[in-house]
Amino acid sequence: MQKALSILIPCYNTYCVELVRQLAEQCENIEGLHYEIIVADDGSCDEHIRMRNKEILELDYVVYLMRKENVGRARIRNFLAQQAQYPTLLFIDANMVVPRADYILNYMQLSDSTRVAYGGYLLAQGDESNLRYCYERAAGAKNQLKERIKQPYRKLRTSNLFILREVVRQCPFDENLHQYGYEDMLLGVQLQKANIPIVHIENPVLFYRYESNAQFVRKTEESLRNLFLLRQRIGDFSQLLNTAKTMRAWHVDWIYLNYWRRKQQAWKAQLCSKAPNLNVFKSYKLGYLISLFAATDSNQPTNGCHAV
């Protein structure tokens, strides 16, 4: 059984006082546990939320660090790991809820040999008109424990991640990623290459805040730009990337790209409507990714072929 824990919460424009109180209460109820909770505000632009989050300083063993500038999801996590005083870390996103009273205990009861563990996530009921909710719900079956165990390195999220500090030092979050998206998948690639096993358990956090459809489409485009930048390192981890590469290998990507360009604005409007369609979302993402490849091709001399 683990004896010490540093709970690390990266925060950006999110009120997280209730989450911190809940985690602190669970830690207090575990006899003999040495713990700390470190919240790092990553240069939030909402000053009201930054000030409200100072309420957590009323709690014992809680540290609140307010950064002046936003440094991104990877760098803030590396920073948190550097600040931790204990060798065992638990990353939780500030916009999550802990739905069970034994959440911390379940991680503490892991074998001392466990280096990385992931507990999964649940979805709070959302609106059928919300694209993010519909997308996460459709993906839910693939993220059940039995499915995660089949693909331990691909089914990993940093929003609920138990990891040893030494592993973060060996496989740090890539600070070249300044935008949102695919840092989880890249970590899975790094852990697999380092032969560091991931233990999957049923110990979820609850996802309950769903951004607007327009915001989610923008975040998706941002994440696809990350995926494109990481295309060599991620390899076959991404099914979407594999599809785009196959279409390029068969030289049919330009056909789809021309179709996507004609449909782009209409599809985007549909996704931002009150009845978003997941098939349209899938098609939009593929076209957007192919367009990134095409933009690179147009900046380089070719002999009629293009590199995958």
Regions found by a protein language model. Name each.
Residues 97-132:
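Conserved donor NDP-sugar-binding/catalytic core segment of glycosyltransferases
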Residues 67-84:
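Glycine-rich, basic loop-to-helix element that forms the pyrophosphate-binding segment
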Residues 89:
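Short aromatic/hydrophobic "clamp" motif used to bind/position activated sugar donors
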Residues 23-66:
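Acidic donor-binding segment of Leloir-type glycosyltransferases
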Residues 179-187:
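Acidic donor-binding loop at a coil-to-helix junction in glycosyltransferase catalytic cores
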Residues 144-163:
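A recurrent flexible, glycine/aromatic-enriched loop bordering the glycosyltransferase active site
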Residues 222-225, 241-308:
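Non-catalytic, C-terminal membrane-associated alpha-helical segments of glycosyltransferases
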Residues 1-25:
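N-proximal low-complexity "stem/linker" segments adjacent to membrane-targeting elements
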